[in-house]
A protein has these predicted regions:
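A conserved amphipathic helix/loop scaffold
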Residues: 1-195
C-alpha cells in the first residue's frame, strides 16, 4: 500500500479480523501514550519494535477496514501519504472502475449517461483553490495537457468529441474499453461519447 512505515497522528482502534481476512498493513504501537504523567520531548512517542497483534488495515471480501481514521487525518493534517494510502485501498476494491482519468489531485471527474440521447458525457474539472483569509478562491486557471481517459461501456461508441468546442477526438476501442486523450483544457471540458 505504501513503501515504508509512517506516523498516524490519531489513535487506532484495536480490531481483530476474521481469520480469513487479508492483512494489508501491520501496526506498531507507541511505547506509551503521551500525557502529563508520561511526557516525551519529541512530538511523537517512539514506537515499539515488535508488530502489534492488531492489524492497521485488513481486507475481508469486498470490505477494507482501517484501524486509523485515515479520512480525518488527511482532513486535519493534509499529509500526502494518507491520501495515497486511501487511494491505494480504494484501488484494491475497485478492480474495474467505469472511468479512469489521469489528472492532478485537484481534478474532478463526473460521468453522466443520457440513454434517451444515446450518449455518455464525462465532465473534467481542474482548478487549484488557495486560501485567502477564511475563503478558498481560484486566482489562476492553468491549462491541462494530454489528459488520458478510459471508460468502460457496453454500447458501441461511434463518435467522441469535446463540447462546447465540438472538436472530434480519436479513440481506441478494445472490448468494452474506450481510450482517448484530451489534448488541452482549462478549468472545464466535457467529452461526449455517442453510440
Amino acid at each position: 500500500l505504501v513503501s515504508s512505515p509512517f506516523l498516524n497522528y490519531l489513535p487506532a482502534i484495536k480490531i481483530m479480523p476474521h481469520n480469513r481476512a487479508e492483512i494489508l498493513a501491520t501496526l506498531r504501537e507507541p511505547y506509551f501514550n503521551r500525557t502529563k504523567a508520561k511526557y516525551s520531548s519529541h512530538q511523537n512517542t517512539p514506537y515499539e519494535l515488535q508488530i502489534s497483534q492488531y492489524p492497521s488495515i485488513y481486507k475481508y471480501d469486498n470490505v477494507v477496514v482501517s484501524a486509523h481514521p485515515i479520512d480525518r487525518m488527511y482532513l486535519d493534517y493534509g499529509a500526502q501519504i494518507h491520501r495515497e494510502l486511501f487511494q491505494n485501498l480504494l484501488n484494491k476494491l475497485l478492480k474495474n472502475p467505469m472511468v479512469k482519468v489521469k489528472l492532478p489531485s485537484s481534478g474532478r471527474v463526473n460521468l453522466l449517461h443520457f440513454s434517451k440521447d444515446n450518449r455518455y458525457v464525462i465532465h473534467l474539472l481542474y482548478a487549484t483553490p488557495i486560501q485567502r483569509g477564511v475563503a478558498q478562491v481560484i486566482d489562476d486557471l492553468v491549462p491541462i495537457y494530454n489528459t488520458q481517459v478510459e471508460i468502460m461501456v457496453e454500447e458501441d461508441v461511434k463518435k467522441v468529441y469535446l463540447i462546447p468546442e465540438n472538436l472530434e477526438l480519436e479513440f481506441i476501442k478494445s472490448n468494452n474499453k474506450i481510450s482517448l486523450t484530451v489534448p488541452e483544457f482549462t478549468c472545464h471540458t466535457a467529452i461526449v461519447l455517442e453510440y
